[in-house]
Amino acid sequence: MDAMDLTVAKFKEFTQLQSSAILLTVVSGIIVIVILLLRSKRRSSLKLPPGKLGLPLIGESLSFLWALRSNTLEQFVDKRVKKYGNVFKTSLLGQPTVVLCGAAGNRLILSNQEKLLSRTVSDRVAKLTGDTSISVIAGDSHRIIRAAVAGFLGPAGLKIHIGEMSAHIRNHINQVWKGKDEVNVLSLARELVFAISASLFLNINDREEQHQLHKTLETILPGYFSVPINFPGFAFRKALEGNSKRRKHFSVLQEKRRRDLSVGLASRTQDLLSVLLAYEDDKGNPLTDEEVLDNISALIDGSYESTSSQMAMLLKLLSDHPECYEKVVQEQLEIASHKKEGEEITWKDVKAMRYTWQVMQETLRMFAPVFGPRGKAITDIHYDGYTIPKGWQLSWATYSTHQNDTYFNEPDKFMPSRFDEEGGRLAPYTFVPFGGGRRKCPGWEFAKTEILLFVHHFVKTFSAYTPIDPHESIWGRPLPPVPANGFPIKLISRS
């Protein structure tokens, strides 16, 4: 075959391949169009919730993002509730979404999270918490991890470690808060919450080591709310790098602890790391190294903002309601009066902080996160006369019950006593600051105890405090709401 014939043959072969490629593209395009038409036809035959999906891909994302930026998300939801009712559809960040409001919506989500919904976190979050963290996994895996962490975060573990937690908080207030005329509550609360996690989860008590890990955490957290672009200079890349650095640090601690446990140099209950390394499920299987690392990291990240923000918001609300603060002072000083010098708070003492717990509940009612995705439908969901198609995202709005006068009298008013008068009569699924069902926040009792102990030692140490700006605004919804400037205050120590 001469060169000309070879060229012609190759040309014919190329033409045939090109024709095949074009044909394949056309056929694929037709198949996609048919699938889209069938889906469209199917959706048109379903009774979807009312609402608007907005522009293709964009949906109502611009309005939603503006509401986030301007702290008007409640108005974004309220406008649609008034127009469409407690169930409406929208499209957010390229995802068709159904928003459920009210107690019935809360019930559907919280009682069916594993039967009807996929995991509640995005791939972006999973890359930071790890694929085996309690916030990502479901089914038996979730049950096993939940049982493992409950041994430390629940009442049994708290009764063992409450004295240690109390001492950490007392020392932190004496060393970092006391002696200063002015402090930023949110900033120091974050420092305190991280120090407690570092000590009680990993037995890290060296101040410099805590400081370096705290700095690393501050590079990780923005990644949870950033665009997931893994490219130099972007927040998500910095978060991934920070997470990798932290995991290496934790891995070294884990290997040393495993050796110490094997030769009796460490206790099986001394901290969360030991508890997880020593845990075996009902079949005698231990947790993997990945499961231990993922869940310690996830619990540190999850508790950091939520707990510190509540400390700041609680003090801010009490500064606006001195009559409530005086009741807290009386309760805490009464408990302190029965303690000997140097004697720490006990589990029994915490259970006696009834009014302070009411204040905390009222703070959570008024300033819980407003809005959040709860997962994607893994099957068609029939609810309130509508069909929520498989693959659509479901979101809820906690404030739709927390701020609803159907469930709470005068919901705009700060009235901690409502949880004394109404606590036993609250309608189910109306007060849900920690979620509910099988995926209720696993650390809610740990956080509750931490905040109550903080209030106790704050009241014991300071006779009064005054906000620098009494009219400081609230920022951060739908994330944990916080005072816009961190709530700077002037402190007056007790003599």
From Swiss-Prot:
Residue stretches spanning the membrane: 17-37
GO biological process, one term: paclitaxel biosynthetic process
Top enzyme class: oxidoreductase
CDD domains: CYP90-like
Record protein name field: Taxoid 2-alpha-hydroxylase
Main location: membrane
Keyword Nucleus: no
Catalytic reaction equation(s): taxusin + reduced [NADPH--hemoprotein reductase] + O2 = 2alpha-hydroxytaxusin + oxidized [NADPH--hemoprotein reductase] + H2O + H(+); 7beta-hydroxytaxusin + reduced [NADPH--hemoprotein reductase] + O2 = 2alpha,7beta-dihydroxytaxusin + oxidized [NADPH--hemoprotein reductase] + H2O + H(+)
Subcellular location(s) per record: Microsome membrane
